[in-house]
A protein has these predicted regions:
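Glycine-rich nucleotide phosphate-binding loop and flanking beta-alpha elements
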Residues: 40, 59, 80
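Conserved beta-strand scaffold positions in the cores of enzyme catalytic domains, especially
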Residues: 33, 50-52, 98-100
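Short amphipathic alpha-helix with an adjacent loop that forms part of the alpha/beta core around
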Residues: 23-24, 59-69
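Short loop/helix-cap segments at secondary-structure boundaries that form the rim of catalytic
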Residues: 42-48, 108
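Catalytic cysteine-centered active loop of the rhodanese-like fold, especially the PTP/DSP P-loop
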Residues: 64-109
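Flexible, polar/low-complexity N-terminal or interdomain linker segments that lie immediately upstream
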Residues: 1-32, 36-41, 117-125
Length: 125
């Protein structure tokens, strides 16, 4: 694979905070934001409207209720964490269209977007 193909492929499977925010504002029904971190991290802080689907628990049974016609955007803490990559890999392996949020939750906050908390860490898919 040459450099151009590599970077094009990388761009095809990533989204940045501004793109995600715009997509959520335009039509939230077309995508699902997936927090691939453990439930405790999700409960402490997550992107609004995100569902918690820890990468370590993804299975056919767990994702059965997910809509295969939607685009799934996986994220984790950010640089230094690969939970979103593992989550994206798992979802793609199960037949879902998925991209990764570049910069994760740290990048989302750094770009000035809000987060929320939940007391019910079981509010997953």
């Amino acid at each position: 694979m040459n450099q151009i193909d590599y970077y094009q492929a990388k761009l095809d499977f990533e989204i940045d905070s501004a793109e995600l925010f715009a997509a959520l504002q335009a039509d939230q029904r077309k995508l699902v934001v997936v927090d691939a971190r453990p439930a405790a991290a999700y409960a402490k802080e997550h992107i609004p409207a995100a569902i918690n689907l820890p990468y370590s628990n993804m299975s056919n049974a767990m994702v059965r209720k997910l809509d295969s016609d939607k685009l799934y955007v996986c994220y984790c803490d950010g640089v230094g964490s690969n939970a979103s990559t593992k989550g994206a890999f798992n979802l793609a392996s199960l037949g879902f269209e998925v991209v990764e949020l570049r910069g994760g939750l740290d990048g989302w906050k750094h770009d000035g977007y809000t987060t929320e908390t939940t007391h019910d860490a079981s509010s997953s898919a």
